[in-house]
Amino acid sequence: MQNFKELGISDKTVETLEAMGFKEPTPIQKDSIPYTLEGKDILGQAQTGTGKTGAFGIPLIEKVVGQSGVQALILAPTRELAMQVAEQLREFSRGQNVQVVTVFGGMPIDRQIKALKRGPQIVVGTPGRVIDHLNRRTLKTNGIHTLILDEADEMMNMGFIDDMRFIMDKIPAEQRQTMLFSATMPKAIQTLVQQFMKSPQIVKTMNNEMSDPQIDEYYTIVKELEKFDTFTNFLDVHQPELAIVFGRTKRRVDELTSALLSKGYKAEGLHGDITQAKRLEVLKKFKNDQIDILVATDVAARGLDISGVSHVYNFDIPQDTESYTHRIGRTGRAGKEGIAVTFVNPIEMDYIRQIEDSNGRRMNALRPPHRKEVLKAREDDIKDKVKNWMSRESEARLKRISSELLEEYDSTELVASLLQELVEANDEVEVQLTFEKPLARKNRQGKGNGSRRGGKRNNKFDNKNKRSKGNFNKKKGKKTDRRERQDKGRSTMKGRTFADLQK
């Protein structure tokens, strides 16, 4: 298997990729990168989860480093995908002075115009808003040498086929290298290829991650204010060897990590603002079992190749199928079984159905565990830990205290009291998570009115700075090296139980 350096990627970019956890190129990256560096047009038929963003993004960074002005334009069907692609490009280009700007509908155009005036090398946008900027001449095409169409079939389904033609016609074929990626190749896309591309190199690859039968996929319906309680109950009952937890934003990752630490879990967070040195430190801890919970954003976790991840928890539901693919693909590797659980607000069920329709299979509904299940799991865990502690030599002063207590109390009552304290430790620790509204309902008809609308579909609600306190009061002076055990047990959702899951 060729590595990135052998494919022609610079040492600086290879160093960045290694820090991100990318050790070897995926098949589509291995096939596409050499053609991209040679300047050839590429027609990539790739399903989600195959690494296609890296297939065009990694060599693109090599082509724009040291250049000024807009060098590359990337079209995406939705604002969410545009933002995701842009964030990953920023990750690929860390420390290389590459500027990436996003343009899409639903955001003030004046702010985007100011960003374009700063001369970014790469622009990522939705078709409608890109055309707005072309018509205003705030996006100039004279320096663009690379045009990339990501998820072209999805743009076609949303009614953007004419917009795609308009944009491709604005950038003369003789000056541009064109890369088009699509999961399917309907006739309209084939016509587009014949009309606007120059003898493209055809690269096909399939999605290995999503076809992996070793991953059991579940969703659980839960309200935002009950999500953290439910999540920690899952951790208590599942007792994952290694778990990756996905949050939608950097703020969410930071707050989740802090909340888990306050509850006694061994957790660290990863997102785009984490330095490379810190990222490497966190990944080393995770691989060496110094921490067992990694909280991450989608982009920060892409490319991670860590064996032994038994569980993936989507604390925030992913906004598209590709993100879901990458998330759950972190588990169920090397022939091992994995479990993926997605938390979903009742009004977000359209997103679950979209993922199911895209992947051709249904997720199973999973009921949050009852109080008795949680307590039983905690008790079993404490029993195992006590047995392990008994193998260690106790300090003399602790033995003296033990003797004094045994003279005053019955041994059975004394041990029971200590065990109860361990089982219920941290139950009253206060946590704070910023309240985030659920995603907007989807229009599942799959057809947009397209032209000039520029990605207004599937917009997220704006985050509100509401604060949500956990249902606990801080208990001072109580510490334990044990994971936090906390539960409210109010859910009555029907579905599979944990006993069913473990059969």
UniProtKB/Swiss-Prot annotation:
Q: Where is the composition biased (Basic residues)?
A: 466-480
- List, for all copies, the residue spans of the domain called Helicase ATP-binding: 33-203
| MF term (GO), any | ATP hydrolysis activity
Q: Which compartments does it reside in?
A: Cytoplasm
Nucleotide-binding is among the record's keywords: yes
Name its GO BP terms in alphabetical order.
response to cold; RNA catabolic process
Q: Where does ATP bind?
A: 46-53
Q: Which Gene3D superfamilies match?
A: P-loop containing nucleotide triphosphate hydrolases
UniProt keyword annotations, A-Z: ATP-binding, Cytoplasm, Helicase, Hydrolase, Nucleotide-binding, RNA-binding, Stress response
Origin superkingdom: Bacteria
User: Which regions form coiled coils?
Assistant: none
Mind naming one GO cellular-component term on file for this protein?
A: cytosol
| Family that this chain belongs to | Belongs to the DEAD box helicase family. CshA subfamily.
Give the protein name, as stated in the record.
DEAD-box ATP-dependent RNA helicase CshA
* Gene that this sequence comes from: cshA
